[in-house]
């Protein structure tokens, strides 16, 4: 089984280079000032210049306005990951304004009822990202996981990715339970919030390659 990978929240040339070297399919940049992983569009542009074309560049946003999306897109992004309370109407507006950009919608999952929102984004988002629900200001990147068994028999309305509490030690179990074909990691390759560890990035990507 071929599982694709996204390393999210990168902010240095060294960690970007490591993610590329070990085969990440997507690299994510956070454009949310309250996050310890936040970068400016200017910083993202500098980092994106070292990423080859075959690696997709995702921007992570929380209820962004179009001005921020435009500035971030100019850095070289290929996709928007929306991690806030964006409604279906708002996503439709973003798609109309940025028709060539891939759109992912993150869903916060704590129980089976939370999956009921997934079909609302059919025809609007290109992909759903299932992440663990958090209680604080930050909508993701907290190292929390939800009960993966919720996805075991679920009929997904869209292509999807798994996130939340993943690391090199549990990724095999996570994929075995959920059947995920795309996995997204942030805090699981950090030594502290916002500080990525190159060894952990390499170990995670190598672990996925062995699946």
Swiss-Prot record:
It is an enzyme of class 5 (isomerase). The keyword Transferase does not apply. Keywords: Amino-acid biosynthesis, Aromatic amino acid biosynthesis, Isomerase, Tryptophan biosynthesis. Its EC number is 5.3.1.24. Pathway: Amino-acid biosynthesis; L-tryptophan biosynthesis; L-tryptophan from chorismate: step 3/5. It catalyses: N-(5-phospho-beta-D-ribosyl)anthranilate = 1-(2-carboxyphenylamino)-1-deoxy-D-ribulose 5-phosphate. It holds the Pfam family PRAI. SUPFAM superfamilies: Ribulose-phoshate binding barrel. GO terms for biological process: L-tryptophan biosynthetic process. GO terms for molecular function: phosphoribosylanthranilate isomerase activity. Belongs to the TrpF family. This is N-(5'-phosphoribosyl)anthranilate isomerase. It comes from Zymomonas mobilis subsp. mobilis (strain ATCC 31821 / ZM4 / CP4). The gene is trpF.
